[in-house]
Structure formats: C-alpha cells, structure tokens
Amino acid sequence: MLAAVALVLAITTAAPLAQHTRLFKPEDLSELEASDRDEWQQPGKIMDILRIGEASVVADLGAGSGWFTIRLANRVGPNGRVYAEDVQKPMIQAIKVRVDRLGLKNVETIFGTDVDPRLPRPVDAVLMVDAYHEAEKPVALLTNVAKSLKPEGRIGIVDFKKDGGGPGPAMEERVDPEAVIRDVQAAGLVLRSRETFLKYQYMLVFEKPRP
C-alpha cells in the first residue's frame, strides 16, 4: 500500500488535477486504509447481502485506493471478474500498483466519467461505497449503471449517515438515504432492502427488474 500511496503523491505533485470539490483528494489516499476499517465496514456481510460469490462479475464504482476491490477479487475468485472504476487517474494508477503487487489477475481498472462508468460487459452486481456523495449528476450516472446490470442484477450503495459521526466527509456533504432512493428509482431500479447493521453508514440495495 505504501507503494500505491507514493505513486499517487508523485503523480499528483507532477500533474495537478482540475479542481473538483466533491471528489476525494488523491493525496489523502491513506485515510481509506484505516487499520480498523474491516471492523466497521464489514465487507464480508456487504458482499453476502449482494450475493457476490465465486465467479461473480462485479463492479467497484469509485474504487479509490482499491480497498474493496481486493476483497471483491478474493471473493469472486479466478473465474470471476472485478471492474475497479474511478474518475481520477491517480486512483486508477494506485489500484494498478496494488493489484500487480498482489498478483490479482481478475481485476480490470476502468477510467470512467462523472456520468458513465464505461463498464465493458453486463455485471451481476455493482458496489458503490462512500462515493455516492461525490456524484455530480447521480441520476445520469445511475441510468448508465442500470444499463450495465444483468436482469435482476443488484447495486449496493453504502455511504455515511448524516448523523453517524465517525470517519467520512463533512456532515454537509453527506446525502440523505431518501434522496439516494429517489435518484436510483428515477434510473429505473427497484429498492429491495435498507440495511442498518453498519456503525457509521447506511446500505441500500436495489435490483434491476426483468423486462
């Protein structure tokens, strides 16, 4: 991970990015690697709820440092596929370093846009962790995400509660789950569950209906 952080800092210093106030700053990448994150993030339970298993094809949107990407890669195994998408090139470079170092062959990085993750094939599930509050045009983004989901494919959106404290963005940047639900339903997906097991975050699970 230190190599990935060093690479991000080098790239950021050499070629400053255009300012985007809602995006996570690449120079703060190490904050995504908190030593207690497994405890409060509960990645295994999140993946279970989304029915992610051996040979699943999944997308990690706003993948950041790749913290969740590597856990997804280990879960889906060599016959599965993980698309690690981000809209910031330093994040993509950091993930590539990390994946190469770990020898993971089932991860593909994708440089997406604010409104299109550019997923190359239909996926079983999409995971968007701590990234929804950064979306500038969430309905447009979710509409394209929905196109990439298989029928009955699932999207899990995990983000910080407005009253949850803990790590995460400033309170004024956090998004009420009811607003997320309205956005996702406007993109044609159906709410399947609201999960409350996380300490600092909420989890919303949506599904793409069959035609």
Regions found by a protein language model. Name each.
Residues 17-59, 65-68, 94-97:
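Class I SAM-dependent transferase core
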Residues 54-55, 78-80, 149-155:
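Short glycine-dipeptide loop
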Residues 58, 126-127:
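Hydrophobic beta-strand segment of the Class I
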Residues 59, 63-117:
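Class I SAM-dependent methyltransferase SAM/SAH-binding core
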Residues 73-74, 139-154:
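A short glycine-rich, Lys/Arg-flanked "PGG" loop and its adjoining helix->strand segment in the class I
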Residues 92, 154-181:
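Conserved class I S-adenosyl-L-methionine
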Residues 117-126:
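A short acidic, Gly/Pro-enriched loop at the edge of an enzyme's catalytic core
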Residues 192-211:
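Core SAM-dependent methyltransferase catalytic element
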